[in-house]
Swiss-Prot record:
The active site is at C378 (nucleophile), C381 (nucleophile). One of its GO terms (biological process) is protein folding. NCBIfam families: pdi_dom. Residues 461-497 are annotated as: Disordered. Residues 1-14 form the signal peptide. It holds the Pfam family Thioredoxin_6. The gene is BS2. This is Bloodstream-specific protein 2.
Amino acid sequence: MRAIFLVALALATMRESTAESLKLTKENFNETIAKSEIFLVKFYVDTCGYCQMLAPEWEKAANETIDNALMGEVDCHSQPELAANFSIRGYPTIILFRNGKEAEHYGGARTKDDIIKYIKANVGPAVTPASNAEEVTRAKEEHDVVCVGLTANNSTSLSTTLAEAAQSFRVSLKFFEAEPKLFPDEKPETIVVYRKGGEKEVYDGPMEVEKLTEFLQISRVAFGGEITPENYQYYSVIKRPVGWAMVKPNETASIELKESLTEVGKKMRSHMVVLWVNISKHPVWRDFGVPEDAKYPAFLAIHWGANYLHSTAEVVTRESLEKFILEFAAGRVEPTIKSLPVPEVETVDGKTTIVAKTMQKHLTSGKDMLILFFAPWCGHCKNFAPTFDKIAKEFDATDLIVAELDATANYVNSSTFTVTAFPTVFFVPNGGKPVVFEGERSFENVYEFVRKHVTTFKVSEKPANVTEEKKSEEENKSSKSNESNDSNESNVDKQDL
């Protein structure tokens, strides 16, 4: 009888918790998240400042009841196994589960309204059948971007491909599926994206999820739109080259270029996605390596981490911009590498200072490399510096390149090195892929990291310099002991006299 009562009480508690953030443990996790179509889970630790900032917004969102959706949280200090199961490496981490299975990580703003918007967008099917054209027209007024798949029925390849691809765009696009006869001006068996302001793009390529995903990533941004902190994430995932028009909105030349960007962006869409940024508000030119004496508007193309800069000796016009993009597409524009000057003496006490211009030389030297990416202003980097200097001296007489690079003043190829925080240390085996160092940044740990991955020579189990230091310490102790004895003997002699 008591057992039945406890079960009933637990179920009642669960029902009452539909408008709060449920506490999840390894014992109840799988069963609990399977109870709802959508379950948004926050992984946190109490000591994290960002977690503390998120907490009130999270609670406000959790207190609103949304059909078929629940919210929960995992304290990773008390539930380390759950944190490990989902490879939680930073806090807070928010993961969406759909029908009990991990679907995606939440990367939006951490406010109540944004969280609720995200949850609502993920409830129900990603693609809605449209029974008439007016339904789509109303959606175009309510949403910034609307996507319509024009197909005969829901069993076509277009329908199944769109349904799968749409899962990743629920927040940024509103999806419909409709019979072609409802849109007589459009080509049947195509996918049409409508953006506010009257812009439209059509996909009639292969019905493959990967190709359609690339199209949707591009088509949700305007032909020549402004990049802002709110939409930056949309541009950051585009695989096609992205061109940045850097403008000063109050200057005539910038106004003229900005007014032409929609037409230029539409014309050049197959080569490049064009955007503009107000450098008076967002001085991105500093990070892109644009010279301080550059004339504005300026233009920079970015592709696979490399920068391609339009001449900054003259202002960019519509004509020069179109010419530049076509030259770029033809492979006739060389990348502009942001780099500090090459130091006169590159290696001091075993540590090599690398700049962007010399990176490739060292990567192809035939040697293994241990490289530190740092920022001059970073406190953790300053604390780690003596340890890294000690490592450099330890391997000074070996074939290992122990190097450092100022990642704020030099171009870092993101396809080779993923640097998301400072300091970051990689071991690069000769001809191999970089391996990131993880763990406490102690001399012993870094030394063992090198010993584990080195390929061009053998590393002893114990560091040579540490052994020498211990030997030196013992000798110093012995010397001091002898000096003390000598002093005592001297005093005795004086007393005897």
